Amino acid sequence: MSTRSGKGITLRELCVFAMLGALMFASKLIMEVLPNIHILGLLIVVYTIAFREKALIPIYIWIMLNGLLAGFATWWIPYLYVWAVLWGMTMLLPKKMPKPVAVVVYTTVCTLHGLFFGVLYAPAEALLTGLDFNGMLAWIASGFVFDIMHAVGNFAAGLLIWPMSQLMLKLKRMYRL
């Protein structure tokens, strides 16, 4: 750990990131009754806008908590990279966009991640379960309706990215994170 010199993270940041990871975990648990509907995409994009590369800390805290609760089984392994893809897509976007553009772009990125979640997950599923390429394509096709639900949920949540990111940036400045 380090001070505000720019290297490492401060104790304050570590505590905040732990709470943000726990918030992701609690939000997913609360929304478990709805198949593939959650605010994880919203939170990942907001955290990435506010904390950039440090956003990986709460993301991986959430992934670890998920594994601890549900077990570190084969379903968990793709989570190690699938959620980082959304983080990476957000990192590649310009930091400063006009509000109307940002609203559309962030919502679109969040929606597309939901739509292609099964495609991103499929290679690990195929490797871990012994599916050949055709089996993997069939696996993707059989789950596509859930990816559509995921995309619709991410679209709805994605509409909140701009106001939530502005609030997170304000809190970040206020608490000197």
Where do the PLM segments sit?
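Interfacial aromatic-anchored transmembrane helix boundaries in multi-pass membrane proteins
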Residues: 25-38, 61-96
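Structural signal for the C-terminal ends of transmembrane alpha-helices
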Residues: 49-52, 89-98, 164-172
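Hydrophobic/aromatic residues in alpha-helical transmembrane segments
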Residues: 43, 85, 89, 120, ...
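Membrane-interface helix-boundary motifs at transmembrane edges
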Residues: 4-9, 93-105
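Membrane-embedded alpha-helical hairpins and interfacial helices in multi-pass inner-membrane proteins
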Residues: 76-77, 99-177
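Hydrophobic transmembrane alpha-helices
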Residues: 1-50, 54-62
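Lipid-exposed faces of alpha-helical membrane segments in multi-pass integral membrane proteins
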Residues: 15, 19, 23-26, 61, ...
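Residue-level signature of transmembrane alpha-helical entry/exit and packing/kink sites
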Residues: 9-17, 41, 55, 59, ...
